[in-house]
Amino acid sequence: MQVTETLSEGLKHEFKISVPASDLDAKAGAKLVDLKDKVRINGFRPGKVPVAHLKKVYGRSVMAETIDQTIRDTNTQLFSERGFRLATEPKITMPSEQAEVEELLSGKTDLTYTVAIEVVPSIALADFKTFQVEKPVADVTDADVDEAIKRIADTNRGYAAKADGAKAESGDRVTINFKGTINGEVFEGGTGEGIQVVIGSNTFIPGFEEQLTGIGAGETRTLKVSFPKNYMNDKLAGQPAEFETTATSIEAPQDIAIDDEFAKTLGLESLDKLKEAARERLVAEFAGATRQRVKRALLDRLDEAHRFEAPPSLVDEEFNLMWNSVKAEMDSAGKTFADEDTTEDAAKEEYRKIADRRVRLGLVLSEIGEKNKITVTDDEVGRAVIERARQMPGREKEVWDYYRSNAQALAQLRAPIYEDKVVDFILELANVTEKKVSREDLYKDDEAEKTAA
């Protein structure tokens, strides 16, 4: 075997490899001998078929198998000897001319092919004991609990009809019939009867609810609005419309007493038990938010500490996935890059940076896990599947069967578990300091969230 490196640029390598025809012939001959005891050919006793006859019958197919196996074995040996870890599948170029192929399959010429690869760079891991990570922690206050219970009460609030002649105010529930038109023409989905609208809930298109303020039962108004530019229906997006609207009833929200009786309507023994349940839920929510903030901070630190060239093909793949998703969302919303105060080129540059970061962090996390023998057990994956199934009541078996028969979906469940275990490993070594923060600071928008791996 002769190997010549024809390209070495960064992480990209290309080799020209030649395997003598005599080597191929010897391997194919061994396969034919092995085949001798396995095939049945009329006119010959089992195991007595001459190899020469087998070659006439199976020679081309056996040589094709031999060539395929030789390429795999040769590549594996080459990559192992040079310490290469492949970022993507190798690209192999074989002879394509019919005459060359015939010569090769008949064993009359050497096997010569090229293999192009892109490798994962060597990654020097940082000393995680030097990492300083801040852990924001917010205490659940009585006010937080009271606010949470008030939100629950608001969603369970009842409404009662207002007195005759009363007008609708913010917070009232108005039952309406309406017919919408654009340029005088009724449009699909633009009519409704018995529709309930809570003024100020912002559940209808902008401007609709506000124009119901002051309306009385039995009164008809023409509401003039414009559909948002990012409205889900492209035909309606940005269009001015008029809705001939009649109010059939006006109802005011009723005060609801937050007491033991209210707690019992929710299946709890008392108000104290409701407060306990609300506090437990908030504690879990705050802990989840803390975890996300710590993880983002750690990923930022890993990003800073591991600057290397990411395999271009992996970056391209990650970028294309993100960009296709961005374009689909923008097209669906009817938005342009100008609406986002940017240009397509600037947006592409930003998303390519994010793609590069994600690939590098993925490689770093993988390297950490591999060097420290971090694995995900089947039990852990099984628990994740069960959790997914619980989120879809009535379809548990369908979910379970889906993951059992779909290796790719199972891998997608395994990946975040693996990532979290690696993150936990690093946090055990890092210097993590708690910092008391308010609930508002804990949940504040963080640009780093966009780039978290």
Swiss-Prot record:
The lineage of its organism: Bacteria, Pseudomonadati, Pseudomonadota, Alphaproteobacteria, Hyphomicrobiales. Keywords: Cell cycle, Cell division, Chaperone, Cytoplasm, Isomerase, Rotamase. Belongs to the FKBP-type PPIase family. Tig subfamily. It catalyses: [protein]-peptidylproline (omega=180) = [protein]-peptidylproline (omega=0). One of its GO terms (molecular function) is ribosome binding. SUPFAM superfamilies: FKBP-like, Triger factor/SurA peptide-binding domain-like, Trigger factor ribosome-binding domain. HAMAP family: Trigger_factor_Tig. Residues 171-256 form the PPIase FKBP-type domain. It is an enzyme of class 5 (isomerase). Consists of 3 domains; the N-terminus binds the ribosome, the middle domain has PPIase activity, while the C-terminus has intrinsic chaperone activity on its own. PANTHER family: TRIGGER FACTOR CHAPERONE AND PEPTIDYL-PROLYL CIS/TRANS ISOMERASE, TRIGGER FACTOR-LIKE PROTEIN TIG, CHLOROPLASTIC. This is Trigger factor. Pfam families: FKBP_C, Trigger_C, Trigger_N.
